[in-house]
Amino acid sequence: MKNKNKGKKSYFIFFLLIVILLGTTLTLWIIQPENFREIKDKVRILFSNHYADTSYNAKSLVLVDLSNDEDFISKNVNEKQLPASLAKLFVIEYGATLAELEDIVPARYEAISLTKEGSSVADIKETNYYLHNLFAAMLVPSGNDAAYVVADYLGGILSPESKTSKERIEIFMKKLNDYLQKQGYKDTVLYDPSGYDEEASTTVIDLKKVVKKLLEYQWFRDIVSQNFYTATLPDGSAVTWKNTNTFLDTTSEYYNKNVVGIKTGSLADDYNLVVLYKMHGKEFLICSLGSQSDSSRYDDVNYIIKTINESNYLKE
């Protein structure tokens, strides 16, 4: 009789261990950001028109209704992240206050040669460009070479006595950081005009601010909304760049006709994306920082777009 009881007890313990193991495995699977995300979101929306969301792959993100500046989805909005190529947005916003778009800018070999190996380029040549050409080269193909040429030129405006490209770029970056602090970008610090720098930092809140400023310029909207952008140089020649934003690519599975810009950025294992989306007669800004892969940043933003499309609250 005792042996039978022992046997039953052993089976019960074994069964209990199996249940615990399966339960633990299922729990770990459910808490992954991508699993049951739709159900999680619907539960949140039942209780609030705005929610802090942990079910996205990105380290930080924010969805903003630009018609009323209301944040609808947010995650770690004040947490500092690597801006990567999104640093170029701050460079352009400041640069637009220092010079005219039609300024003719010489692309010096010294500045171009500062481009780090393996980084994104616009194949800038040693010739003259309009400033707006170079802004487009920074925004569309995310050209780091163009960023150094722009910083070199603007540094020369700020410090005409500087003799080398490196000196001019250093002056520009110092003045840029001063400007950022004065303008209220309190969590943004940049050390390289291209964003190829693992010491830099920003937040989705600061990105929201700079993008809102840039969207006031029609030329900025025109540049970032195109999958292919053709620039006409001062000598009459033309160069065409392809946008790194896959949402604009008609051949991509992520293509969305209602996405009208803005920009991508990636460095090391962090993948960033800022998107301007039109729906319900309004514009929505999505800033996403620190996804683990190229596809996950698009999947996150794609899901937010789906939320916008289906939300009765955001239609108002």
Stretches with model-predicted labels:
Residues Y11-F12, E34:
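Ser/Thr/Pro/Gly-rich low-complexity disordered regions
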Residues E34-I205, L214-L215:
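Active-site-adjacent loops and short helices of periplasmic peptidoglycan-processing enzymes
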Residues M1-Y11:
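N-terminal Lys/Arg-rich, disordered targeting/topogenic segments
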Residues T24-E38:
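Membrane-interface motif at the C-terminal end of an N-terminal transmembrane signal
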Residues F14-T27:
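Hydrophobic membrane-insertion alpha-helices, especially the h-region
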Residues K42-S60, D152-E316:
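Penicillin-recognizing serine hydrolase domain
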